[in-house]
């Protein structure tokens, strides 16, 4: 048997020990879309409101399909930052971007940030000059033609400010060379932080659905929750259009352990146990149905019917209570009105006046004839009013009897579900009628009247006085008209004869107007 020597066995043993703990060989994590940390088109930005849950800064221009961080102008910078912090410890970000410009040399580039604090616009690719977190830089500076364009992952603790991505203030974790300028289609960058490792893959952008290619894998890297996502861009002496079409964020979590399939006997046992519980529940309710086991659909239908029956009975009980209360109120109102009006043809207890069957007033006790005459004139109106009130009382009595009959029928029969609102409307209408009838009764009760004296006559104007004043006004009007006509005739006669009366002429503006309009005759002296 040949002997094994050298470092080969030790290296294989180390690989065997590390393989179970490798995150790549385990189950993929569960992804959950986080809409408050994402944006995409169409209708990416709301008119006048910006991007939901995001803020834009600098020279960023919001559109319906994309966010243009910097236009193709020199010395411009713009950024977008999430308003909400990241509450989870593992995440994945998919960013779709496009960088276009003239020539082979590009502007400064773009950056994707995950930092402890929200930034606005800074000197490092439009982002923060001093940050606590990581930044993925898409560099395309015109000065570095050898290593440009490139993608770099930098980390910083926020203590030393940085002016450029490679000035030494930040720690470079990894990089790869990737030409992302002037692609036929927008390129996608997938950044995954899982198991304290940061991985990034990109597609070429030559076709809309290119597969992703590996770029950077750094770790161990500790990124605490509570940070903010951001994307920034900047231009220098040369200008490019830096566009972000979508920014999708997913939270990652451990997959839940799969439930092993239960054996057939255990499933049957659980099903029988559920049926037994249902039977005991039905027996406890006191139902008379057959206790033979039924299918799940039939049991569910029976439970729904039982629930509907209980709900219907409860509604019927409430309807009966409302009808009883309404009947009591109607009876009380009827007693009050009968007490106030009394039956037809019977004298009232106060001796005010007596009514016959036709609600007329044959006699009225009083001490003067003029009071009897005024009351006899208004007796027809008062009788009509009392007759209308008596008719209304009879109608209310009929409605109360109908309500009592409906309550008696509801006790022995089931009403269809959904008619409760009709009784509520009836109760409301009868309540309004009762309130309207209580108003005159309260007014009559509050008005004090000595016993034996009829109600006071109306305080309105007497017809005789009204006719007297009308006659005086008519006579005066006709007298005035006759006087004006006579005056006009006398003036016309004077003008026709050419001689004026010796007496003083009356001062009337209309007569003078007629005099001015008449031409002077030739025989009148000047």
Curated annotation (Swiss-Prot):
Keyword Signal applies:
yes
The residue ranges for the Cytoplasmic side of the membrane come to 484-526
Cystine crosslinks: 176-215
Q: What are the boundaries of the signal sequence?
A: 1-25
How does the UniProt record describe the way this protein sits in the membrane?
A: Single-pass type I membrane protein
Q: Which domain of life is it from?
A: Eukaryota
Q: Which GO terms describe its biological process?
A: endoplasmic reticulum to Golgi vesicle-mediated transport
GO terms for MF: D-mannose binding
Q: Where in the cell is it found?
A: Endoplasmic reticulum-Golgi intermediate compartment membrane
Mind telling me what this protein is named? Protein ERGIC-53-like
């Amino acid at each position: 048997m040949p002997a094994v020597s050298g470092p080969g066995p030790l290296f294989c043993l180390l690989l065997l020990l590390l393989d179970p703990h490798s995150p790549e060989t385990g189950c993929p994590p569960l992804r959950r879309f986080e809409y408050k940390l994402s944006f995409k088109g169409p209708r990416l930005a709301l008119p006048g409101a910006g991007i939901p849950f995001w803020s834009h800064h600098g020279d960023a221009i919001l559109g319906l399909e994309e966010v243009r961080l910097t236009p193709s102008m020199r010395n411009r910078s713009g950024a977008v930052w999430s308003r909400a912090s990241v509450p989870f410890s593992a995440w994945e970000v998919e960013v779709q971007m496009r960088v276009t410009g003239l020539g082979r040399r590009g502007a400064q580039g773009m950056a994707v940030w995950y930092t402890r604090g929200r930034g606005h616009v800074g000197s490092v690719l439009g982002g923060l000059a001093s940050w606590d977190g990581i930044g993925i830089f898409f560099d395309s500076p015109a000065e570095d033609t050898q290593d440009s364009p490139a993608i770099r992952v930098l980390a910083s603790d926020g203590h030393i400010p940085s002016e450029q991505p490679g000035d030494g203030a930040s720690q470079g974790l990894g990089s790869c060379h990737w030409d992302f300028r002037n692609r036929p289609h927008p390129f996608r960058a997938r950044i995954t932080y899982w198991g304290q490792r940061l991985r990034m893959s990109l597609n070429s952008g030559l076709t809309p659905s290119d597969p992703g290619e590996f770029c950077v894998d750094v770790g161990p890297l500790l990124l605490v929750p509570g940070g903010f996502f951001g994307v920034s861009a900047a231009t220098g002496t040369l200008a490019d259009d830096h566009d972000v079409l979508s920014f999708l964020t997913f939270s990652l979590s451990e997959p839940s352990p799969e439930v092993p399939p239960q054996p057939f006997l255990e499933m049957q046992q659980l099903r029988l146990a559920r049926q037994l519980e249902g039977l005991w529940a039905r027996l406890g309710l006191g139902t008379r149905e057959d206790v033979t086991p039924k299918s799940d659909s039939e049991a569910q239908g029976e439970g729904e019917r039982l629930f509907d029956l209980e709900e219907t009975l409860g509604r019927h009980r409430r309807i009966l209570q409302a009808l009883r209360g309404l009947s009591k109120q109607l009876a009380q109102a009827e007693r009050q009105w009968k007490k106030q009006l009394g039956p037809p043809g019977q004298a009232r207890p106060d001796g005010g006046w007596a009514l016959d069957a036709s609600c007329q007033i044959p006699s009225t006790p009083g001490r003067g004839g003029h009071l009897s005459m005024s009351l006899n004139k208004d007796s027809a109106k008062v009788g009509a009013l009392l007759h209308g009130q008596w008719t209304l009382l009879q109608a209310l009595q009929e409605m109360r009897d109908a309500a009592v009959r409906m309550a008696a029928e509801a006790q022995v029969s089931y009403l269809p579900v959904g008619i409760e609102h009709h009784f509520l409307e009836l109760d409301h209408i009868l309540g309004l009628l009762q309130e309207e009838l209580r108003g005159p009764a309260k007014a009559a009760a509050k008005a004090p009247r000595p016993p034996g004296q009829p109600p006071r006559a109306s305080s309105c104007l007497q017809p005789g006085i009204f006719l007297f004043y009308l006659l005086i006004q008519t006579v005066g009007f006709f007298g005035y008209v006759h006087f004006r006509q006579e005056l006009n005739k006398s003036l016309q006669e004077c003008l026709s004869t050419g001689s004026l009366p010796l007496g003083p002429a009356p001062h009337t503006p209309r007569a003078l107007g007629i005099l001015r309009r008449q031409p002077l005759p030739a025989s009148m002296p000047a």
